[in-house]
């Protein structure tokens, strides 16, 4: 598949999830997303209204993080926060699973949580992304989560919050994609800091990339394509 520079830009969820992010930081994030035509800004739930207003009239989404970054909230509170974020302008949701229940092998809980979160999103025509936080999981746990997701069908499964002990890994993206196939998309996030990282994740099967280095990556890809005298890059999927 051939990707133009704008195609690459539309894979990027431009991210600022820091606790000390200011209103000026949020405005900068949105301005950059508009300038480079990124797909989404990824922000903490409380910033949903401000960012959605900044992005009004554009095709750039406001993505709210729910139960972030630990996932340690009840299903009811996650659903409430999801609906609240959507009410305040969020039109994509990224939530963190309850890792404690996964470790306890309470797969019914994980499935119920995923289903209720998908329902809360889809009743408002909003995509739902499920964050696994792979750095804390075994390969078998990643596989089990992906199998549950294949059944429940959120819009995306996602590698990481970026706040754990490590971020996205190529082998994890490949594993997740091998299980869900084309039925559920895969988002890679965490530690993706340059164009080589970015391209490696896309080649591995990532359909979306969450990163705070979106501008740097965009500019590096632009330079690479200019130097190679091409207007697109071929990536085998």
From Swiss-Prot:
Keyword Cytoplasm: yes
Superkingdom of origin: Bacteria
Name of this protein: Deoxyribose-phosphate aldolase
Cited HAMAP family: DeoC_type1
Chief location: cytoplasm
Cited SMART domains: DeoC
Gene Ontology cellular-component terms listed: cytoplasm
Record-listed E.C. numbers: 4.1.2.4
NCBIfam families hit by this protein: deoC
Similarity section: Belongs to the DeoC/FbaB aldolase family. DeoC type 1 subfamily.
Pfam families: DeoC
Pathway: Carbohydrate degradation; 2-deoxy-D-ribose 1-phosphate degradation; D-glyceraldehyde 3-phosphate and acetaldehyde from 2-deoxy-alpha-D-ribose 1-phosphate: step 2/2
PANTHER family: DEOXYRIBOSE-PHOSPHATE ALDOLASE
GO biological processes: 2-deoxyribose 1-phosphate catabolic process; carbohydrate catabolic process; deoxyribonucleotide catabolic process
Subcellular location: Cytoplasm
Active site feature: 94, 158, 187
InterPro entries per record: Aldolase_TIM, DeoC, DeoC/FbaB/LacD_aldolase, DeoC_typeI
Its biological purpose: Catalyzes a reversible aldol reaction between acetaldehyde and D-glyceraldehyde 3-phosphate to generate 2-deoxy-D-ribose 5-phosphate.
Keywords tagged on the record: Cytoplasm, Lyase, Schiff base
Gene3D superfamilies xrefs: Aldolase class I
Catalysed conversion reaction: 2-deoxy-D-ribose 5-phosphate = D-glyceraldehyde 3-phosphate + acetaldehyde
An annotated Gene Ontology molecular function: deoxyribose-phosphate aldolase activity
């Amino acid at each position: 598949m051939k990707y133009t520079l704008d195609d690459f830009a539309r894979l990027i969820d431009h991210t600022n999830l820091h606790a000390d992010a200011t209103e000026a930081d949020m405005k900068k994030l949105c301005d950059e997303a508009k300038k480079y035509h990124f797909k989404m800004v990824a922000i903490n739930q409380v910033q949903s209204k401000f960012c959605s207003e900044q992005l009004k009239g554009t095709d750039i989404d406001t993505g709210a993080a729910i139960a972030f970054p630990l996932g340690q909230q009840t299903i009811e509170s996650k659903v409430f926060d999801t609906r609240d974020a959507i009410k305040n302008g969020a039109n994509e949701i990224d939530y963190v699973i309850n890792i404690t229940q996964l470790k306890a092998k309470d797969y019914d809980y994980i499935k119920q949580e995923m289903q209720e979160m998908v329902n809360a999103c889809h009743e408002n025509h909003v995509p739902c992304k499920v964050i696994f936080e792979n750095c804390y999981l075994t390969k078998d746990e990643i596989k089990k989560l992906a199998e549950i997701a294949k059944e429940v069908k959120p819009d995306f499964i996602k590698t990481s919050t970026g706040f754990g002990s490590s971020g996205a890994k190529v082998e994890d993206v490949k594993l997740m994609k091998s299980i869900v196939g084309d039925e559920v998309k895969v988002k890679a996030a965490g530690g993706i800091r340059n164009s080589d990282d970015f391209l490696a994740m896309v080649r591995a099967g990532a359909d979306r990339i969450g990163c705070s280095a979106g501008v740097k990556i965009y500019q590096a890809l632009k330079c690479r394509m200019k130097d190679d005298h091409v207007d697109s890059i071929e990536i085998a999927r």
